[in-house]
């Protein structure tokens, strides 16, 4: 209660006639609730607006908001490090995959024949008794259609 009296003497514009709630709080202070001996302490709270400015205000134990001296505006600390979200990381990986796919589209991919393909190729040639010169003996060229 002494802090309220000193705040009124510091600010002549905030008189009892301008603020009728001040007189009501003086009446409440004489109620038996505050006579239990518990002191009302002020707690500082920080609020941040959309521009990133921090405002510090004080709230008493009874729930009333009071000024803590003057309201400070402290800009938030901005970090220089860019943190990637998982969505950005996935997009970046997709871009890399697309670039590698384009490289594979330009170069022809040599297909490796499985053992079953080799045996099928040999049995068909053996069935028709096709004479094979040494140039056509390589099956991979015929499968990849490079010699035709």
Swiss-Prot record:
Function: Acts as a critical meiotic inducer by binding non-covalently to protein kinase ran1/pat1 inhibiting its enzymatic activity. Inhibits ran1/pat1 by acting as a pseudosubstrate for ran1/pat1 instead of its natural substrate ste11. Inactivation of the ran1/pat1 protein kinase is both necessary and sufficient to divert a vegetative cell from mitotic division to meiotic differentiation.
Biased composition regions of type Polar residues, renumbered to the chain: 1-20
Comp. bias regions, Basic residues: 75-86
Superkingdom in the source lineage: Eukaryota
GO biological process, one term: negative regulation of conjugation with zygote
Residues covered by region (Disordered): 1-96
Low complexity composition-biased segments: 21-46
The name this protein goes by in its record: Meiosis inducing protein mei3
GO molecular function: protein serine/threonine kinase inhibitor activity
Record keywords, A-Z: Meiosis, Sporulation
């Amino acid at each position: 209660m002494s802090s309220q009296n000193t705040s009124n003497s510091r600010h002549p514009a905030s008189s009892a006639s301008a603020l009728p709630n001040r007189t009501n709080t003086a009446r409440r202070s004489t109620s038996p609730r505050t006579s239990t001996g518990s002191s009302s302490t002020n707690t500082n709270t920080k609020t941040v607006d959309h521009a990133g400015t921090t405002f510090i205000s004080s709230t008493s134990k009874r729930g009333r908001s009071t000024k803590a001296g003057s309201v400070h505006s402290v800009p938030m600390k901005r970090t220089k490090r860019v943190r990637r979200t998982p969505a950005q990381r996935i997009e970046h990986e997709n871009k890399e995959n697309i670039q590698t796919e384009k490289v594979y589209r330009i170069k022809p991919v040599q297909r490796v024949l499985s053992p079953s393909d080799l045996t099928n190729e040999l049995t068909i040639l053996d069935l028709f008794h096709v004479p094979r010169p040494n140039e056509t003996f390589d099956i991979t060229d015929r499968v990849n259609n490079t010699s035709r």
